[in-house]
Structures are given as C-alpha cells and as structure tokens.
C-alpha cells in the first residue's frame, strides 16, 4: 500500500524530520531505519523510551549501539537532501498496516517502532539483539495506551495521562516522602465511608486554609500503603491531579478537554484501582472554559454521578460557597466532609508526630517545650492563620535558623572579623606617619590586632569542632529516618503475606535486624546529646566565658523569637535588663513628661501587667481616656510610651479624630464596604494594626469625631478585635489604646483656680463626659486619667528639657552653651499661660534664644568649641562666649 505522510501524528512527523536532518548532516545519501530509530529514542517527552523501558530494554545501551551503527553507514561530503531508502519505505508501510489493524486513524511513533521491528533492516537487528520483537512492542503499547485509539495528530500527548498530569501519593508514601498524619481519624474514616459507596462516592474536604485538608488525602495514601484500610481499598492508588500541568501548554481549543478526558479514561480503565484527588477543587470549575467549550466540571459530572470515577476534592469554605455551591449539579455529586481547625492539644500531638522529620531535615534537636510553645504562641499571637499550619511553620523556621548558623559565620566571629578589617585599614594609613602620636596609635592598633587574631583563631577552632559534631548527629538522624521507613515497609509486607496465607518469616527476620540497628543509632544520638548537655553545663559555670557558638536544640525561647519577628510582639522571655527597665518605667517616662503622676502610673501598670503575662488575653493591653487642658502632656505621654516600648517615638498609630467629623467617615477607619470605591484599600485603623500588631494607638481629640465613630470602638475596647470592611478580624489585644480629649478642660481649669479638691474635679469632669460620650463607651475604658494644669515649678523643668534639645542641635555645629537660673526663670515666666499649657514655651525659646543664636552663627561670631553663656540682665537676654 502507498504510504501517506499526512497520516503521521505530529510526534511521528517530528521523528521522520529529525531522521532526515541526521542523515543529511552526516552526509548519508539515504534515510535509513537506523536514523528513524535513533530520532525516536532521543525524542524528548516522546513515547519511545517509556515503551522500551516497559519491556526492560537497556535504553542507554541501545543509544550507544545506534551511534556505532550509524557511523558505519556510507557517507560523503557535499551530498544534497537525503532521500528515503527502500527499507525505510517498507518499514513505513508496515507501520501504516499496524495502525490500520488497530483501528487507528493516524500512524503514531509506536507504530513506526512496530514497522521497524516487522521488516528486514538493521534497526530490527539491533532490537532483536536486545530481545525486542514486534509482539513485545504491541503488548507494551496496549499497557500504555489502554483503551485509547489514535484519532488525532496529537494522540501521544494523551498517553500515560495519569503519569504526566498526576502525582501518585501512594508511591510517595511507599518511598517515605510523605509526612506522617497524626489525628484526623474521624475525617479519614468518613472519607473511606464515602469512597466505599456504590454511587456518588466522592468526598470533598472543606475547611479553612492550613487546617490539613491535603494531609487527609496523604493520610489515606499512607494507610493504603500500610494496609490499614478496608478490603475494598487495599491495593488502590491515590493520584493527585496536577491542574497546572493539565492546563500548561494547552494552546488550542479542545487541548485541555482532550487531556482531561484521557485522565478520566485511564481512571475508569483502572477498574476502581485509582482514586483521583483534586486539590483546590474550585479551580476545576471554569478551567479550560472558553466560548463554545465545556469547562472541566461539565466533563467530570457524568463520571461522578455514575460512580465510575472515585474522586476526593479539597477546597476552602469560601471557595466552596463561591464556586461549587453555585453549580447545584456538581455540588450534589460530592459529599462534604468538614475539616475543622484542631485545638491546641491536638496541634501539640500533630507536632510531636512531625518532630522526627524536622529534626532529621535540619539536623537539630527540638524540645517538647518548643512544640507546646509553638502551638500556644501561634494560637494567641498569629490571628489571621489557622492551626496546625502556623504552628508547623514556627517549628520549621526556628529549626532553620539554628541550621543556618552551621553554614554561616556565628555572630561573635563575624563581629571580630569586621573589627579586624577596620583595624587593618587604620594600620595601613598609619604606617608611613612619623609623628609621635601616630606612632603610639600604630603600636596600640598592632597590639589590638594581635589580640583580635588570637581570639578569632580560637573561636574558629571552637566553631569547627562544634559543627563537626552537629554534622555527625544529623547523618545519624537521617539514617534513623530511613530505617524507620524501611521498618514500616517490612511491616506492611508481612501483613500482606499473612493475608495471602504465605509465610512472613523473611520480613520478620529483616525487621529484627532493622530494629537492632535502630536501637544502636538511637543510643548514639542519646550519648551525643548527653555529652552536649554536660559540656554546656560546664561552659556556663560562673567565671568561664567560653560558651557555645552553635545552638543544638530548638527551645521555647527560639519559638518566641520567631513569633516576635513575625508579629513585632515581644513574647521572648524577659532579660534582667528589661525587667529592671519595666520596674522603673515611671522614671523613664518622667524624663520626657513633667508632672502628671497619675497618668504615668496608670500607663506603666498596664504595660507591666502585659509583659508579666497577667493581662486578659481578650482585651487590649490598656485603654485610657486622657482628659485635660491643651499643652499639659497628653500627646507627649503617648510619644514617650512609644519610645519606652519600641525605642522609637514614631512607632505609634496616630489618628486625628478631627478628620472623622461626618457620619460616613467611619468607613475610613475600617475600610469601605463591598461595592464602594476604596473597598480594596482597607481601613486606616485596621490596616495599621494588621501591619503592626504591637503598637500604641493614639486617637487624638476624640470629642471632635462624630458620635457614630465611638460605636466602632466598642468591640476594640471590650473584645480586643475589630472586623474590617473585607470581613477580616483584626486583633487589638497587643495594643495600648489612648484617646485624648479636651472635654471638661474648662472645668478642670476652674476647679484648679478655685483650689477645689481632687474628688470635686473628678465629679465635675465625669458629668461633662456623660453629657458628651455614650455610657457603653465610657464603661469599656480601663481608666479615665485627668491631666492637671501645669504649675510654675513644672514649667521650669519643661524649659530645661526643651533647652537640652537645643543643646544637642548646637553640638552638631561644635558649640555648647550654659544658661543661668535667671534666664531659665525669665523664659518660664514669659512662656507660662495656664490656659495654653507648655506650648507657648517653644515660641519664647525660639524668639528669645534661637533667633539671636542663629544670627550669631551665620556671622561666625563664635569659633568652634566655644561655650556660649546665656544670661538675663533684667531687661533682655545676654549672649557671651
């Protein structure tokens, strides 16, 4: 029969074209069957190599034989285009006959191989040498293709679809690449029950991100591998569908559907041996959808309904509602299995099960207290994620930090190396100097360099020794991990043999050997850890400064460090220096805030309660309403608090409530609702706290805001939480909420001038508050703090504080100043106004001190290093220097 080139599939055409290119470049006059076989074997992503491997052909050996045979073919330079040889023509016709006998519409690559094996040529001789016949090829073809026929030019892309577009979880379980699944027994049992149904045997796992939906599918694969499943599921495979691979490269309409159909066909042809797992099930709805074509969900529906396809889906609650529930026909084919978030106790159990894997991977020891801390701290401080995922991430990152210290230079060595480089730079510049001072300095630098080099050498030696021990323990842990997996494999084999009525003696014999080796390795690990512990205790004795450079175990302190890095909340154990700072917090605040003892004490007590762990975990650290006249230190106390807590006064969320005078402006705090402009941007308050959960929140000038704004704050003050416009819950439990107001300031001023008592003032202020704010708002505030008008003595102290700021600015110009008591008294007297507080002082200092000094500096009146004396002679300020 005549052979038609247009009846070749795309891949087969590529093979023939490549064979022609090989023949032409080698100077062969004809395209030989050897060229075609060589092109087929070397084709990337082709069907030839898997086909030959199926019948146990040594493909590398075949390639080397082909190379040597091709070199023997006659060749000459200057040859034109190579033509098809008579033997290749016969082979092509035989391949067309093979396709026709199998009812295929196109000649695919495997038909070319059959044609080569059926006709008399050198390619057949090579295949025969390796024990390959045309019948072997046909048998392997039927195994790879299944019931599929070649009906289009891209048929090869649909072969072995499950291997190309799926990940065999059961195979991963067998090779020990899946983490153990702890707990979740009820959910796995429910999944098995649904899978065992006759029809609609398709469970869908629904739960929040990170609760372990995919882990349940992996747990099922592990149970199948271990034989811990009902008889109906024994020997089955769980294959995870890779939607990315399925969609990638599907250029033309219908490509995606063709691939999916081939996957479904292979699952059906397996006679129930394959359970399909579709992670992110919502991606299937609409996948491949285009005008006039069916999406993946519509291809799945008939198979799901008939029970011909067993499928496990996994998706989140939101995605299930948005995508699956909308399609009622798809929804009814799936049986929901809800996967809830585990509690802290269950999370600790999960972490204990995963602990050996992470110890083996990172080469560090993880203490049990670290696992408990990871579960507790992640539950309390990481509000926008779910257990156990966030707790596992904490353990992983803390362990990776310690593992990284082995690879990178420890901090003491790094610090010494940098210091040594600085000294070498100074030394190079002093080498040629002859001045006595320079010579002395050079000798001093040389001595310091020698000392630093000696210390560096000692530290490097210690680091290498410690690192060597760590590497040894890590390799032992990895061997333990492998042996434990081997033990599980042998156990599963023994159970399988017992079920078949065979003797499992061989398996039990090897299990005893593995168990013995495991005991040896565990003893080595215990001995190494005991040695490390005793070494650590010896090194930490008083007076011995040599400490470990590399930490070998993850403790709760390392977990707390990671939480602090993620959230900014200081949950690490307090050092003695921090304890001392907190105990004298009032003194530190009074360095900036003059007077106002009641306010300073209230704020300090709240912070101490929080850091000592006695704070209610469901409320903010503290919520205060600061009342008093303008300029008495309300905002300044907030800045001082931020500086004490974060070493940065700008580390606070400051919101001017005068911007929220209209009723609708409340949406700016929490974000616009859906459908309004700005919905995606989030709220001014909620976004600030999401980014910095540990903060001082200052709501300035509260009485200027619309009363409806206070309603938003009720949940913040009572429950420490607020839901923004996008439905996300923002955690305020690690914030200090301070509201300032001038309500009652006239009353405070009047009572102070009249010499009234504290009780009279508080009662008058409370009456003014009740008239302005809602009772439910006032009732949720921890403390209402009254700021008293400043006295003359306090004003004098504020003058000194503000002059200290001026002193630091003058120091940049190489100048300093001394100021007399007369000058300070004059500034305090001129700048004191009970109605305006301390703010006029800045204007007086600016006018009377800064302006004359600025003019003098511009005129070069004072040489660098001059100390300027500032006095007041009764009429004006006098500057001399």
Swiss-Prot record:
Name of the protein in question: Chaperone protein ClpB
Region (Repeat 2), start-end ranges: 84-147
Domain notes: The Clp repeat (R) domain probably functions as a substrate-discriminating domain, recruiting aggregated proteins to the ClpB hexamer and/or stabilizing bound proteins. The NBD2 domain is responsible for oligomerization, whereas the NBD1 domain stabilizes the hexamer probably in an ATP-dependent manner. The movement of the coiled-coil domain is essential for ClpB ability to rescue proteins from an aggregated state, probably by pulling apart large aggregated proteins, which are bound between the coiled-coils motifs of adjacent ClpB subunits in the functional hexamer.
Region (NBD1): 160-341
Region span, NBD2: 578-789
Subunit structure of this chain's protein: Homohexamer. The oligomerization is ATP-dependent.
The keyword Transmembrane is annotated on this UniProt entry: no
Domain of life according to the entry: Bacteria
Binding site for ATP 1: 207-214
Annotated Clp R domain residues: 5-147
Residues that, per the record, bind ATP 2: 628-635
Region (Repeat 1): 8-73
Main location: cytoplasm
GO CC, alphabetical: cytoplasm
Function: Part of a stress-induced multi-chaperone system, it is involved in the recovery of the cell from heat-induced damage, in cooperation with DnaK, DnaJ and GrpE. Acts before DnaK, in the processing of protein aggregates. Protein binding stimulates the ATPase activity; ATP hydrolysis unfolds the denatured protein aggregates, which probably helps expose new hydrophobic binding sites on the surface of ClpB-bound aggregates, contributing to the solubilization and refolding of denatured protein aggregates by DnaK.
Keyword Repeat: yes
GO BP field: cellular response to heat; protein refolding
Region of interest: Disordered: 528-548
Family indicated by similarity: Belongs to the ClpA/ClpB family.
Compartments reported by the entry: Cytoplasm
Residue segments, region Linker: 342-568
Stretches the record annotates as C-terminal: 790-881
Coiled-coil region: 392-530
UniProt entry keywords in alphabetical sequence: ATP-binding, Chaperone, Coiled coil, Cytoplasm, Nucleotide-binding, Repeat, Stress response
GO molecular function, one term: ATP hydrolysis activity
């Amino acid at each position: 029969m005549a052979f038609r080139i247009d009846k070749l599939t795309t891949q087969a055409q590529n093979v023939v074209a490549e064979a022609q290119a090989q023949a032409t470049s080698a100077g062969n006059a004809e395209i030989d069957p050897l060229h075609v076989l060589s092109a087929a074997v070397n084709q990337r992503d082709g069907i030839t190599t898997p086909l030959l491997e199926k019948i146990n052909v040594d493909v590398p050996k075949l390639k080397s034989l082909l190379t040597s045979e091709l070199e023997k073919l006659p060749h000459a330079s200057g040859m034109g285009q190579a033509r098809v040889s008579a033997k290749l023509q016969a082979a092509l016709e035989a391949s067309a006959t093979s396709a026709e006998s199998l009812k295929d519409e196109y000649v695919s690559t495997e038909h070319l191989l059959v044609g080569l094996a059926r006709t008399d040529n050198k390619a057949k001789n090579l295949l025969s040498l390796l024990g390959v016949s045309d019948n072997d090829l046909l048998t392997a073809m039927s195994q790879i293709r299944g019931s599929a026929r070649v009906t289009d030019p891209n048929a090869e892309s649909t072969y072995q679809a499950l291997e190309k577009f799926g990940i065999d979880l059961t195979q991963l379980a067998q090779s020990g690449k899946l983490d153990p699944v702890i707990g979740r027994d009820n959910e796995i049992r429910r999944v098995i029950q649904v899978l065992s149904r006759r029809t609609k045997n398709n469970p869908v796992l629904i739960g929040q991100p990170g609760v372990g939906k995919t882990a349940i599918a992996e747990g099922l694969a592990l149970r199948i591998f271990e034989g811990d499943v009902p008889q109906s599921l024994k020997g089955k495979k769980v294959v995870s569908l890779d939607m990315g691979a399925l969609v990638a490269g599907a250029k033309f309409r219908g490509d995606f559907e063709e691939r999916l159909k081939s996957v479904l066909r292979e699952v059906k042809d397996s006679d129930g041996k394959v359970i399909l797992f579709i992670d992110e099930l919502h991606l299937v709805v609409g996948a491949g959808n285009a005008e006039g074509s069916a999406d993946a969900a519509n291809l799945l529906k008939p198979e799901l309904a008939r029970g011909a396809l067993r499928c496990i889906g996994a998706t989140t609650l939101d995605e299930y509602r948005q995508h699956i529930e909308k399609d009622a026909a798809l929804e009814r084919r799936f049986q929901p299995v809800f996967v809830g978030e585990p509690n802290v106790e269950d999370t600790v159990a999960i972490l204990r099960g995963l602990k050996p894997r992470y110890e083996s991977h990172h080469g560090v020891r993880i203490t049990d207290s670290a696992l408990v801390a990871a579960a507790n701290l992640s539950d309390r401080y990481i509000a926008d994620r779910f257990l156990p995922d966030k707790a596992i991430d904490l353990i992983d990152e803390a362990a990776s930090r310690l593992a990284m210290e082995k690879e990178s230079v420890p901090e003491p060595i790094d610090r010494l190396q940098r210091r040594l480089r600085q000294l070498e730079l100074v030394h190079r510049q002093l080498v040629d100097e002859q001045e006595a001072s320079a010579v002395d300095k050079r000798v001093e630098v040389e001595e310091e360099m020698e000392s630093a080099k000696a210390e560096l050498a000692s530290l490097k030696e210690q680091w290498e020794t410690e690192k060597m021990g760590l590497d040894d323990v890590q390799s032992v842990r990895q061997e333990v991990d492998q042996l434990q997996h081997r033990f599980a494999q042998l156990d599963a084999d023994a159970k399988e043999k017992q079920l078949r009525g065979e003797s499992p003696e061989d398996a039990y014999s090897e299990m005893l050997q593995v168990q013995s080796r495991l005991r040896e390795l565990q003893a080595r690990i215990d001995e190494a850890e005991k040695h490390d512990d005793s070494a650590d205790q010896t090194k930490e004795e008083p007076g011995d400064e040599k400490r470990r450079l590399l930490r070998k175990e993850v403790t709760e302190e390392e977990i707390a460090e990671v939480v602090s890095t993620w959230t900014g909340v200081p949950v690490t154990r307090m050092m003695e220096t921090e304890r001392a700072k907190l105990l004298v917090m009032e003194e530190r605040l009074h360095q900036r805030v003059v007077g106002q003892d009641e306010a300073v004490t209230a704020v300090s007590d709240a912070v101490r309660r929080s850091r000592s762990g006695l704070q209610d975990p469901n409320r903010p650290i503290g919520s205060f309403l600061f009342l008093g006249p303008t300029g008495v230190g309300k905002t300044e106390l907030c800045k001082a608090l931020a500086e004490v807590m974060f070493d940065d006064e700008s580390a606070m969320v400051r919101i001017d409530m005068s911007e929220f005078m209209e009723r609708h402006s409340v949406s700016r705090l929490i974000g616009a609702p859906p459908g309004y402009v700005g919905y995606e941007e989030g709220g001014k308050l909620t976004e600030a706290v999401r980014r910095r959960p540990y903060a001082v929140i200052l709501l300035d000038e509260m009485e200027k805001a619309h009363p409806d704004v206070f309603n938003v704050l009720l949940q913040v003050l009572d429950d420490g939480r607020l839901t923004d416009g996008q439905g996300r819950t923002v955690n305020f439990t690690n914030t200090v909420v301070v509201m300032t107001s001038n309500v009652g300031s006239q009353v405070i001023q009047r009572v102070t001038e009249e010499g009234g008592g504290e009780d009279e003032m508080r009662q008058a202020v409370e009456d003014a508050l009740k008239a302005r704010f809602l009772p439910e708002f006032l009732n949720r505030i921890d403390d209402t703090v009254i700021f008293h008008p400043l006295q003359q003595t306090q004003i004098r102290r504020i003058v000194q504080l503000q002059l200290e700021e001026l002193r630091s600015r003058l120091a940049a110009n190489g100048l300093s100043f001394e100021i007399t008591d007369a000058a300070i008294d004059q500034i305090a007297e001129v700048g004191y106004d009970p109605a305006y507080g301390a703010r006029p002082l800045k204007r007086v200092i600016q006018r009377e001190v800064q302006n004359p000094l600025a003019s003098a500096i511009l005129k070069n009146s004072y040489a660098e290093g001059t100390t300027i004396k500032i006095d007041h002679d009764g009429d004006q300020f006098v500057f001399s220097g």
